[in-house]
Amino acid sequence: SAVAAADPEAASQVATAMAQAAPEAAAAVAAGVASGVAQAAIAEVNQETAQANAEIQADAQGQIGDAQADFAEATGAGSETALADAQGEIADVQSATQDALIESNQAGQEAALAASQEATAEIISEMIAMNPDAAAEIIAGTAASNPEAAAEIVQEMMESNPEGAVEMCADIAEANPAAAALATEAIIESNPELAIEATAAMAEVAPAAAGAAAEVMAELAPEQAGEAAMAMQEAAPEAAAAIAGGVAQGNPEVAAEVANEMAAADPEAAADIATGVAVAAQANAQAEVAEAQAEAQAQVAEVQAGLADAVSEAQADLNSDDPNIVADAQATLADAQAQIADAQAAGQEAIAEVQGAAAETAQDLAGDIAGAMMEANPEAVADIAEQVAESAPGTAAGVMNAVAEVAPEQAVEAAATMADANPAAAGAAVEAVTEALPELATEAAVAMAEAAPEAAASIAASVAQANPDAATEIAAEMANVAA
């Protein structure tokens, strides 16, 4: 890494020699080279950006100097209008300078990213050419620090040598399971007819890579997702949860079909499949909320940027000796604050709406798949309840609704199992049972309170919210058990 950062031209020769001397270290060496080359490329672009920023600031200082001269002249003459004009001109220059610096920095970041990818791809390609036997390890190492460059190299190699594409995928995944996603994407782009075979090969040598591969298959090749998932499941049965979850995260629309196919092939995997989908559903909901939060922040920032010039000018006008100008400035600032507050309120409202919709979607997806898995393997109900409570408590209500619909005779046991596995999921679980099976509400609440006494208050509150008429009776039964 140090050599690559200091002298990128010599880095490939040094790194290749190191990798040839210690093949087991090829991935680590490649990661270091990729990191170092990227640092060097970014440093060069950053230097250019800094120079451009200095020129922007120098130009702004010149304009501000001219305005300050006008300011001094206006002060001496006592001209209120000229003074206000000078202050406004300075505010405009400062605002324009800030915008120019933001634009320059953004362009610099984009240029730095492009330069780092180009430089990394070039030097890593040279390493592979000089040490082809370590190609997979070199790519896997590169992916750890610069996945975009690694993906570019992999796709080029697969297009030039399709016969070795499957083996390359397996070798990359074995060296770095986290690189399975880029390998899957590359083979879909270059040799889609080999994608199923490649994903199975990756899962066989690196079960930890199966989830990422399944996610990419579902997203980019949904028509092959089911067959690929079953091939991976056969190669790595222990990865069933990750595979089902990957499919659900990559493309929720095909999750049910794929999960059913997987369960039909191996009913014993039903609990793992249901859990994997529940975890993915919860993650999808969290991602949607995060996206809504980022969008809301961007909208507020856009409003603030649109008001920046007016705010800057108004702040300058506050120094005026003319009370009318000061009053107008104060009104402008108050209006700006109101507009920003409105944007913030609208953002919070949008976030809340997305949170509700995302949570409902997650509950529905997790519940639908859990129900299908219970039908495929009725003996898996308790295991599904336990694993979901532990791994995806945010979907507990949806899964308990599935229990109530598919296996109501196991609802009390499943609810108690959930509470025992994760008391934090108890409230949502008992609320679902109370709404779906009110005749079992008391029995379920008591069983859950026995399994998780620390969650008794949450259980009682959830019951009261779901069925106020029965709350007193259920609370009394819970109190008797506690006593």
Regions found by a protein language model. Give the residues of each.
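General marker for long, soluble alpha-helical cores
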Residues: 1-483
